[in-house]
């Protein structure tokens, strides 16, 4: 018996791999997008700090820009440095 495929429709899903399920700043799911974005994906990436906490890029940038003196992680209060 031989099987011949006449038509194939692929379906895919994606998700960010992070320590948590939600952003610690906006509390939105990482599989969604931050409040500033309309659609999730590459335009709303996740960023990690050296402390290994993860946030939407737009959320942490707003947080850091709002701090006057030294920039700290909103979760553990360590000095914020982006993980490379």
UniProtKB/Swiss-Prot annotation:
Posttranslational modification: Auto-ubiquitinated.
Gene Ontology terms for molecular function: cullin family protein binding; G protein-coupled receptor binding; ubiquitin protein ligase activity; ubiquitin-ubiquitin ligase activity; zinc ion binding
PROSITE patterns: ZF_RING_2
Pfam families tied to this protein: zf-ANAPC11
GO biological process: one example: cell division
Entry's localization field: Cytoplasm; Nucleus
Residues noted as binding Zn(2+) 3 in the record, renumbered to the chain: 34, 37, 44, 58
Amino acids binding Zn(2+) 2: 51, 53, 73, 76
Pathway this chain belongs to: Protein modification; protein ubiquitination
ZnF segments: RING-type: 34-77
One GO CC term on file: cytoplasm
SUPFAM superfamilies in alphabetical order: RING/U-box (SSF57850)
Binding site for Zn(2+) 1: 23, 26, 56, 59
Family: Belongs to the RING-box family.
Role, per record: Together with the cullin protein ANAPC2, constitutes the catalytic component of the anaphase promoting complex/cyclosome (APC/C), a cell cycle-regulated E3 ubiquitin ligase that controls progression through mitosis and the G1 phase of the cell cycle. The APC/C complex acts by mediating ubiquitination and subsequent degradation of target proteins: it mainly mediates the formation of 'Lys-11'-linked polyubiquitin chains and, to a lower extent, the formation of 'Lys-48'- and 'Lys-63'-linked polyubiquitin chains.
Subunit structure: The mammalian APC/C is composed at least of 14 distinct subunits ANAPC1, ANAPC2, CDC27/APC3, ANAPC4, ANAPC5, CDC16/APC6, ANAPC7, CDC23/APC8, ANAPC10, ANAPC11, CDC26/APC12, ANAPC13, ANAPC15 and ANAPC16 that assemble into a complex of at least 19 chains with a combined molecular mass of around 1.2 MDa; APC/C interacts with FZR1 and FBXO5. Interacts with the cullin domain of ANAPC2. Interacts with UBE2D2.
UniProt comment concerning the protein's domains: The RING-type zinc finger domain coordinates an additional third zinc ion.
Name of the featured protein: Anaphase-promoting complex subunit 11
């Amino acid at each position: 018996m031989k099987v011949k495929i006449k038509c194939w429709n692929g379906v895919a899903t994606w998700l960010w791999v992070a320590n948590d399920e939600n952003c610690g700043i906006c509390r939105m799911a990482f599989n969604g997008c931050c409040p500033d974005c309309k659609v999730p994906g590459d335009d709303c990436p996740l960023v990690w700090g050296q402390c290994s906490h993860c946030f939407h890029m737009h959320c942490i940038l707003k947080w850091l820009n709002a701090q006057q003196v030294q920039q700290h992680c909103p979760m553990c209060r360590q000095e914020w440095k982006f993980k490379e």
